[in-house]
Each structure stands twice: as structure tokens, then as C-alpha cells.
């Protein structure tokens, strides 16, 4: 799915915030090509977004919210990553997103937290409109506005609205039948530093990235390890330094002899995994006729690198 608009109320420090991720018209003199929905050349959206801001400005929180929204779309369940700011007030999110089957969706969810912090849905609105061959994102957004205002869909549209009462809770039954394809990969900063379990690491990408950060690294050797007799061997990566030192990146993402690395090089392992995931997904999905949209979110892993290196990686 491709996010085109996000509105947040009472989530983390977002009291009433809205983010537009679409273009009203084709942009000129931009470094990226193809910032439009495949098959809909006038439906422009921002393919890559670089979010900047000071400490505690909401960058990590935004990633957690987006991840929580995508999990809700997949499982129809609210997760703890959607944290309320004022616990005694309802929170809500409203997202517009496009999918590869040429539909522009809108989802509105209002929810609350009880004394134990458990989240419960109070109201749900969901609908979609068709994206015609020459439609812009602005045009279909106007269609969504009308659909949600009137609540009466045309034969080519869909609309669902459910609200809880004192007697009845929100069941989400019609919405549970709506299935969304696509996936996501969020690498978010936390209070405890950790690396992600490696599943699609590419040895060549790992070597190119970390040697960019640390010139004392001479190479990377891919090896295998057998965790148990009934499991297939897992990949590990031996990082070799000029002075004969070495570090090992395990299949769980742990790094031995990590003190040998600078903080920037340590984080570069995560960056390599992130880039590997994007390239691997592109290669795997390129052979499909119905290519699903994927979301990738990298949080602060370039904070300890030189600005020139940061630009090269991006």
C-alpha cells in the first residue's frame, strides 16, 4: 500500500497533525523517477521521504504509528505501539492509501484505552474509490471526501461505518473480510540498542556499506553455522580488519567483538540489512504481474555517520 495522507489525533505528541504524501502535479527537476502509481501515470505520490527534526520531535513515534496502522490493516487488531497522549481522551488515525488494484482507500479509526492500557475500537469508517486512468491523487481524494461526507457509495465504490454503543461493541465483521497485500520493514530506534535478525542480508551489500564507513575493514566472508541438527545451516558474516582483528555478525544479528567498531560502523550493519531487504524485495517482486507496494522505514541509523556518507547511502 502507498500512504498518501495521514491524520493523527492524540497519538504520542501528535495532538492534531496531518501529513500529505502526494503531489498535485508532476514534479520537475527531481532525482527520482516513477513517483506515480504503476498504471496510473497522473497519480503522483512521494516515493521517498526524509524526515528531519530535533530530539523528541516525533520521528520514531511516526514510524511506530505507521507500523501499528499497517498491522491493524493486516490483522484488524490494535497494538500497543499506538500510544495515547492523554489517556482519558479518545485517539484516532485517518489514513488514505492506494493499492496496486487501482483503488484509493480511506480508513478512520477512533479508539480508547482502559485502566490497564488495553485499546478498544470505538468507531471505524472505511471506504474506497476507483482510480481511473487519468485520475490524480487530488481528484480521488475529493471523491473520498464526498464518500465519507455523504456515506452513500456508487456502484464502483465501497463504504463501511460502525460505531460502538453502550450495548454493542465494534465487531469489524465486514472490515475483516477486506484483505490487503504488500508488506513492510521498520527499523526503529529503541531505548535498548539491538540489531535485527538477519534473513536477507546480502554479503556484497554488507561489505560495500561497512567499508564505506570504516576503511580499516578489508573484506567480509560469508560462512554458515548449524544451530541444531534438525535445522538448515544459517548464514554468518566474518568482518576482517587490516590488523587481523575480526568481528562476526551472527544469524540473530549479534555482533561479536563489537567494541572493535565505531558506532557508525556498528549501525552500518543494520543499514546493510535494510538496503538488502529493499533490493531483495525488488528482485523477487519484479517477476510478478501484480507487484504489491512495500513500506520501508529506517530510523536514526545514519545519525553517527558523516553527512557526505549519509547522502551517499540515501
Where do the PLM segments sit?
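Switch/communication elements of ASCE P-loop NTPase nucleotide-binding domains
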Residues: 1-75, 247-314
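Phosphate-coordinating catalytic segments in nucleotide- and nucleic-acid-processing enzymes
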Residues: 2-12, 16, 20, 72-282
Amino acid at each position: 500500500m502507498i500512504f498518501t495522507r495521514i491524520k493523527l489525533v492524540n497519538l504520542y505528541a501528535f495532538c492534531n497533525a496531518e501529513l500529505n504524501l502526494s503531489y498535485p502535479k508532476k514534479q520537475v527537476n527531481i532525482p527520482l523517477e516513477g513517483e506515480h502509481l504503476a498504471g496510473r501515470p497522473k497519480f503522483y505520490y512521494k516515493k521517498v521521504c526524509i524526515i528531519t527534526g530535533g530530539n523528541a520531535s516525533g520521528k520514531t513515534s511516526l514510524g511506530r504509528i505507521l507500523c501499528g496502522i499497517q498491522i491493524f490493516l493486516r490483522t484488524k487488531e490494535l497494538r500497543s505501539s499506538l500510544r495515547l497522549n492523554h489517556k482519558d481522551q479518545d485517539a484516532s488515525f485517518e489514513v488514505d492509501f492506494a493499492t496496486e488494484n487501482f483503488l484509493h482507500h480511506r480508513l478512520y479509526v477512533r479508539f480508547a484505552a482502559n485502566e490497564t492500557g488495553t485499546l478498544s475500537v470505538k468507531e471505524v469508517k472505511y471506504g474506497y474509490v476507483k482510480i481511473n486512468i487519468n485520475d490524480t491523487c487530488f481528484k480521488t481524494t475529493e471523491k473520498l471526501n464526498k464518500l465519507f461526507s455523504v456515506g452513500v457509495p456508487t456502484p464502483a465504490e465501497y463504504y463501511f461505518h460502525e460505531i460502538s454503543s453502550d450495548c454493542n461493541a465494534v465487531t469489524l465483521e465486514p472490515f475483516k473480510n477486506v484483505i490487503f497485500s504488500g508488506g513492510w520493514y521498520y527499523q526503529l530506534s529503541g531505548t535498548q540498542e539491538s540489531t535485527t535478525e538477519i534473513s536477507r542480508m546480502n554479503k556484497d551489500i554488507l561489505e560495500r556499506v561497512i567499508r564505506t564507513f570504516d576503511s580499516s575493514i578489508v573484506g567480509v566472508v560469508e560462512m554458515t553455522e548449524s544451530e541444531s541438527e534438525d535445522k538448515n545451516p544459517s548464514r554468518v558474516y566474518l568482518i576482517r580488519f587490516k590488523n587481523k582483528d575480526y568481528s562476526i555478525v551472527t544469524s540473530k544479528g549479534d555482533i561479536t567483538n563489537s567494541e572493535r567498531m565505531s558506532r557508525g560502523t556498528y549501525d552500518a550493519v543494520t543499514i546493510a540489512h535494510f538496503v538488502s531487504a529493499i533490493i531483495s524485495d525488488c528482485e523477487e517482486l519484479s517477476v510478478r504481474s501484480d507487484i504489491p507496494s512495500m513500506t520501508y522505514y529506517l530510523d536514526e541509523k545514519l545519525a553517527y555517520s558523516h553527512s557526505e556518507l549519509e547522502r551517499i547511502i540515501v
